[in-house]
Swiss-Prot record:
Its cofactor is Mg(2+); Mn(2+). It comes from Aspergillus fumigatus (strain ATCC MYA-4609 / CBS 101355 / FGSC A1100 / Af293) (Neosartorya fumigata). PROSITE patterns: ATP_GRASP. It is an enzyme of class 6 (ligase). The gene is fsqD. ATP-grasp enzyme; part of the gene cluster that mediates the biosynthesis of the isoquinoline alkaloids fumisoquin A, fumisoquin B and fumisoquin C; as well as small amounts of fumipyrrole as a shunt metabolite. The products of the cluster lead to a brown coloration and are important for growth and conidiation. The nonribosomal peptide synthetase-like protein fsqF, which lacks a canonical condensation domain, is required for addition of a serine-derived dehydroalanine moiety to activated tyrosine but is not essential for the subsequent steps leading to isoquinoline formation. This is ATP-grasp enzyme fsqD.
Amino acid sequence: MLRASASGAKCAVKLIVPLHRGFIVRSDIIPLRLRDSEYVESAVSFAEPLQTYSGKKVAISSRSDLTTYFAAAAAGLILRQGSTHASDAGSQALFQMVESDLANRLSFPWIQPGTPRRRTLALVDANSSHPQDGLGFYRAARELGINVVVLENAGHWLEDPAQAHWREAFIPTRLTNPPEEDVGDHILASLRAYGKPVDGIVTFADSFWYYIARIAHEIGVETAPPDSMRIATNKFLTSKYVGHDAYLASNVDEALRIAKEVALPYPLIVKPCDGWSSEGVSRVESPDAFPAAVKSIDTSRHGTEFVMEPYCDGPEVDVNLVLLDGEVLFAEICDDLPKSADVNGLTVGSLTNFHELYSVYPSALPSKELELLIHSFVDTLLRLGIRNGVMHLEGRVQNSSMEYREQNRMMHLQPRAPQATRPEPSAWLIEINPRPLGMTGSHIIESTYGIDYWGLAAVLGVGDKDRARALSQPYRDGPQYTCVMVFIPADFPPSSQGIFDTDDICADLLARRPDLAQHISRCATLVRRGQKVAHPTTGRHTFLAYFNVFSRAGREEALDLARQVREEVRYSFL
């Protein structure tokens, strides 16, 4: 089908008409699954949340009867036409390639049988500090037809009636982090004040899960056992549970005494029990390094208790799992390249911490080691009684057959030299997060595999098992490319004021390097000019920006493009 564009040039359009009877799994599913398609310039959904379709073929009176076409369509596509597609033969070839691409991306039950039912999900902690941040979950819930009841402190921007389109209700609820012991009572009181049943309750702030699990039965919903959530969200308890030689301390003197009494082998990792974003995580090489490591923990955010445990120098990974009744619906693993504080880390500015620098999707570890990680981590979750949800776990492969080596100013996974005495590889769990990985991190899964973790968290949260199974199915042919998330952490001299003095990091780079721009799926600048940013030595980690950089040619090109993006970033601080 052809239509005239605004410039007078012709372009090809394709409409997607459902031929199965039922309701759409989420209203934006077709644009979501077609992101970064080589053949689609833009995709627009015509569907409403939970919209039903008859599944009948379209009967038209003439080729010009566009109204009937559009009325039946769930979405429309404008195809990407190059010079080779200008002729009729070229257009036919384009349509054939599009059909093949659609078969890859839409070969799953995106039309669900039966009658849809709108469900309600309670969310503890809004997970969004301002209207321009962290809306992915709310957008997903809206497209899924799930009502969200937000429990958050009074005065949050979501309480504003002008923002009511993002939620069903806002219930002012006293929340502190770290939580107060009676926070469960506050949550229960708020849900009773809401006065209507909910189909589920979730949080994306890990420290609240234990308290939610304690009161869940009183509102008629199921979660993992409270003690299990306590272990999963406390890094000391997690380490002890999986058998690490871990110790708990609250100050430097206590840490030094323990290290001496039990003769802990250096290097050690010191990290807060209730931490996030790798804040306050240090590698300690000797007793003299303890004071600086403990000082780097922001106790106002993470509390005073910290873990001491052996440092594992194997390749680091993120393992993301979708669980339903103990079954793994989807699993993927990415490589976290060595950080500045790793023994083999790259030098990036003045950073000497565990701030993320690069994450590469999918992992290049051997399939045997990938299977080992998934089997080990799933076994840990199931032994804890955690059987449902989107899980983000971090770990390493101890005694891996691979190691990182620097090549062309970038770290590459390479086979290690064979050793007859090397132990077999084993999975080393760093932490469990009973939630999806961060919002920006989840975007890369969406574009690489076609799966939105935040939408899955919503449908699993309300117990919608059929939609969870459908939305857990990746592209039929696997990841569409290799993608690298390039993190741009705050880095500036400690003597400066820490005032960000740049406009838009991403817009600047895209304008200067259009050759790199065509390999960037998503990017965002996360701070604004004039904003005061904490220095990394304070224990706070701030991302200035991120870029999701992809290559269809393979991992080596993706890593080189990622290196170029980092080197081209420009910013300044006052």
